[in-house]
Structures are given as structure tokens and as C-alpha cells.
Amino acid sequence: MNSAFQNIRMRMDWVKELPDVFLDRQIEQKFRWLSILWIMALYVAGVFFWGNFLNWTRTPLDFEDWGIINSPRLDFFADMFREDKLPLHMDYPKIEGQEHPLHRLTDRYLAIPDVITTPQILLLKFLSINKFVYIDILINFTIATLGLLWFRKKYELSLLAYGILFLLFNFNGYIQAHYAVGHITWGGYFLFPLFVALVIQLVEGQPNWMWVTKVAFLLYYMVLVGSQHHFIWALIFFGVLALTSWDKLKWIIAAGFFSGLLGAVRLLPPILIISHVYDEGGNRLLPGYPTIVDVFRSLAILVQPSEQNFVRSDVSWLMHWEFNIYVGLVGSLFIIYFGMISWFRNARRYPALQKLFLPTLVVFILTIGHLYGFLRKFHIPLLDGERVPSRMIGLPLAVIILIATIYFQAWLDEKPKMNLLVVVLSFSMFILIANDLWAHAEAWKLSAMRTAFGPVQMALAGSSVGNHPDQPYFTVIIVGTLLSIFTGMFLLFRSWREHPLIGK
């Protein structure tokens, strides 16, 4: 009888502790299976989310930048595999009243900095463009998940804190909107958790060649995924970080320098079209967010994709996908309180995170109005390639979401266990954030976008590979390839010298 009573009591205690498993890492240790199940469930939910967002690859990618820019570019690679040719020159007709996949600047495909050249492009030999897009998003989403798990481990995030972080980072309006309109090259956004993790490692420890190698290869992949913009923002972030980390200056410079050299195979060919870009006005600077108020409105209010001038900039045709950072009202309050107010009020709690404040602030400021024009005065081609400053908010948004979650966990740790109010409030936040992000996805998913904007003209029939003799172009590609290879070998060698695997 006593034994049966004890079993019932133990089960009741188990049920009683269950809510706190999601809020307290110590209690979580008793339920390891639940931790694994929760993390896997979130990942599977993400796979479902992006599949549903893409309408399970059924929606034709023939609208907005999908149809104008990226479907023709991906079809170019598919043609390359069908014909066993190199991806050198693109032969695509100019369609009246429509942008060209290579922006009417050149037929040299690799001279355009924001085209995808990742290893997974090989999948286009077997997959349709729609299926490739889904797989490509899942690959980058998986990389983001690994980065978020690094933060969970380092800052001992509870299951619920990790869940909120997972939702806010992976499914916010910023990344949804860019994929919705056809910016497949926005995969670099998913690399930001690992980038911020490397910045924290720099600030907290003694950097070395292994750290430089990690940064260089991460940013190299960022370039390969077509995220030239994100690469630039990361370099700006490093540049400002150097001002507050003089003792790490040489390592920051080394990371930026070797990132550029490693990416030479993709960063050198655009040199050939710089004069055309300036002559054609292809890099004309557009305005960012008119005011800070517009930033907070874009954070909290769900705007339909076809709605114009919600953010009233100087350019009336700029659509909301250039300003969208939606996380909903609850998500906004979460970010503002824990990611801004708590960060400022309790900065000393996490000394390493203090170093992130100035770079995050500077990149954010550059998204406002015409302030990015200050950097354009230096006439540095890499910086001049940034023409829509509001897009840069992706990096500070990622940083603040990460920091908000860290301070949210600190807040949880200060509360007494089994506090009903804390449990209800925390779970309510998770549910409401999930609901708001799903509502946004329903409004911005590809099928809704195609209905709102309709198809454009595309010329995907026949071959778009039009290779021809072009010695300057070939020379630059060869030089860039050799620089990338030798830089990669050098970095791996220096890393091996620091951490030799043989003889241990």
C-alpha cells in the first residue's frame, strides 16, 4: 500500500515539475528525453513552416524577383548541367519594362556578386528550381539552428527561452519577406548566430589563427550563398568592433583581410563591371527608414505585402519587404524590454555583450534615412554596393533577438521556482509569438504573393549558357580561384600548427 502511494506521489511530483522543466535548466536535467524531444520538435516545425511557406514547391516562381532575377539565374545553372558547360556567360533576352537577371550590366555571370555558387547548386542537376529552393533554405536554416544551439549551451537557456529564440530568429517578418519576394540570396541571414558567436569568442578569449580561419570560412560561405550584402554588414560590424577592442585589433584585421582573400574567387570578378555600375547608376543610394518610429511600427504591425507606403520613404515604389521586421506586439515587447532595456540596465552582467553594443548601434543607425551616405563618401566599391540601407537591419535585429533571449533567461533565473505567474506569462509569450509569426506567414507565403502581384515574363526555354572568348574575365577568375585555394591552405596550415592532430 505504501509502495503504491509512493508511486502515485512520485508521478504527481513529475506532473507538477513538468512546467518548470521548460523554465529551469536544473530541473530539465531530470528529463533529458524531453529536452531532445523539444529541440527536435522545434526543428521539425521549422521544416514544416518553410515547406508550407513555399506551398510545398507547388507555386510557380514567376513573380517579382523570383521571376525577374533568381529563377532565370537558377535555370542558368540547370542549363549548365544539362549541357556540360561552365557557368561563365549568361545569354538571356532583355524584356521591355523589366529588370534583367544580371541587371543589364554584363553577360559575365560570375561578375555579379550576389549570385549563388554554393556546393548545393549541384542539386539543380537532379531537382527542379522549386525543390532546390526548399532544400537550400533548409540547409541554411539548419546552420542557423546549430548556431542557436551554441547560444543555448553557452548561456544555459531553458527549453522555453530557446523556443522563443528559435521562433523570433528563424521566422520573423524580415527573413519571411525577403524569401517571399524572391531574395534567395538572403541565406546569409541564417549565418548570423555563428557570426555573433565568433565575435563573443573574440571578446572573451585570446583569438588565434583557428579563430581567424573559422571567421574566414564562415564569411566565405556567406559570399558563396550570394549574401554579398550580409558580408559587407559583417565587415562593418567588425570595423566598429575594432574601435572598442584595440587589444584584439590585429586579429580583427586579419579576419577581415583573409575573409576577403578566401572569397577572392567571387569577389574579384565584380571588379570588371564596377565602371558600368557607376555609369548606369546601378548603385544609386535609396533611403532607409525615415524615422526610428517607422522601425518600431514595422516591428509590431503586420502589413500586407501589396500595401504601399506604410513606411513613407522618399521613393514611393519601395515596397514593404524592404522594411519588414515583423515579430508581432508580444515579440516587440519581448525584444524592447529584454533586448534593449535590460541590456542597458544590466550591461555588467555579461561583460562580453557590452562590446556588441556599439557595432550593433552603428549598423542600426546606418539603416535610418540617408545616413549610410556618409560611408558612400569614401567611394569604396564594396561599401558602394549597398544601395538599400534598410536591409542592413537584419544584423542588429539578429543581435538584439539573441541578447533579448539571454536576458530573458537571466530574468527567469531570478524568479522563484514553481511561480505560477512566471509559468503562465512565459508560455503565453511563446504561444502568442508563434501565432503572430504564423499569421504573418499566411499573409506573405508564396501563393499569396503570386496572387497579389501576378506573374512576370520569363524566358526559360532553350539554353541560357552563352559562353564565348573573354580573356580578361577568364584571367580574373583564375587569379581569384588561385588566391582562394592558397588562402584556404594557408589558414588550415596555420590552424593545424596551433592545434596539431598528429601526435596527440
Where are the model-predicted features located?
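Start-transfer (signal-anchor) and selected internal transmembrane alpha helices
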Residues: 1-53, 142, 482-504
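Periplasmic/ER-lumenal interhelical loops and adjacent helix-loop junctions
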Residues: 13, 68-89, 94, 98-100, ...
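Hydrophobic alpha-helical membrane-interfacial segments at the cytosolic entry of transmembrane helices
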Residues: 37-43, 247-271, 283-286, 353-363, ...
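Membrane-embedded helix bundles of polyisoprenyl
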Residues: 43, 145-151, 160-204, 208-244, ...
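Membrane-interface coil-to-helix junctions
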Residues: 43-144, 167-190, 287-315, 371-374, ...
